[in-house]
Amino acid sequence: VYKGVLYLLAATFTFSLVNLGVKLLNEPNFLIPNPHSYPVHELVFFRSIISLSICIVVVTRKKIPFFGNNKVWLISRGLFGSTGLFLFFMTLQHLPLAIATTVQYLSPVFTVVVAIYLLKENVKWLQWLFFALSMSGIFVLGFESSENDAVNFWWILVGVISAFFSGVAYNAIMKCKNTESPITVVMYFPLVAVPITGIWCLTGEFVIPVGIEWIIILLMGILTQIAQVCMTRAFISDSASVVAPLKYVGAIYASLFGYFIFDEMLTTFAVSGIILIVSGVVLNTWYKKIYLRS
């Protein structure tokens, strides 16, 4: 088993818990019957400030150069990653959890496409068929918007844009794999996000958390740090075409969370879309493993 595969599976599950936190803070549930409606920039700020604090402690103790070496790609990682996260949190607030997460998992496709130009990675034609199979699942979700009033196709498009920005961010990570410590790569995400969202919180809408909401926000920050480290190590350990598609597995976690916690019922279109996506992922990983062995 590829080390990168294990790292990304761990990252995907942890990120799913963070996404669950966003939903818990915005929709009625058994933990918070009447949650505040948090603006997206505030959620990104809290998530980022906790992650940044942890990064600073680690970097200081290990005496790692604070700003790194490959600053252009590190800043690019922060900018594209922060923008992708902001747009993704918007979709979490406006779409069912499973659908918002599934649309976001187009990012592995964009990751591989961008890697062809930036990293000169070699992708076989059969892999493109598997990617197309996964993408067809996204298009099936488009039919969901015509059947379900809770699904607005506009927010699906926002999710696609978010996935593209995330795909570019993942390539920036791989550009830094030979020059930077993983913690430095992780740190640039909140290092860019905190000043931007912090100013936004000061000048725009801001909701003061209460009670258990503080605990959820704290856990979101800590889990984000764990997920970021696992994800960064995954992309450093293996090629984009092997690692990136495994992010799709998070759609399964999201479906279960949505069903059991928020009573989000999946229609035939939604289930079919998720099955297509996961099938494409499994086939791609299997093919790449066989190809490398040969």
Where are these regions (language model features)?
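Loop-to-transmembrane-helix transition segments
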Residues: 4-10, 59-87, 153-162, 208-226
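Helix-helix packing/entry segments at the starts of transmembrane helices
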Residues: 100-106, 176-192, 228-260
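Hydrophobic/small/kink-forming positions within alpha-helical transmembrane segments
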Residues: 12-16, 20, 49, 56, ...
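C-terminal-most transmembrane helix of multi-pass membrane proteins
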Residues: 252-294
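Transmembrane alpha-helices of multi-pass small-molecule transport proteins
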Residues: 33-80, 165-169, 188-203
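Glycine-/small-residue-enriched transmembrane alpha-helix faces in small-molecule transporters
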Residues: 1-39, 149-175, 294
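Specific alpha-helical transmembrane segments that line the substrate/conduction pathway
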Residues: 42, 49, 89-122, 240-258
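Juxtamembrane helix-loop boundary signature in multi-pass membrane transporters
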Residues: 1-6, 109-164, 178, 278-294
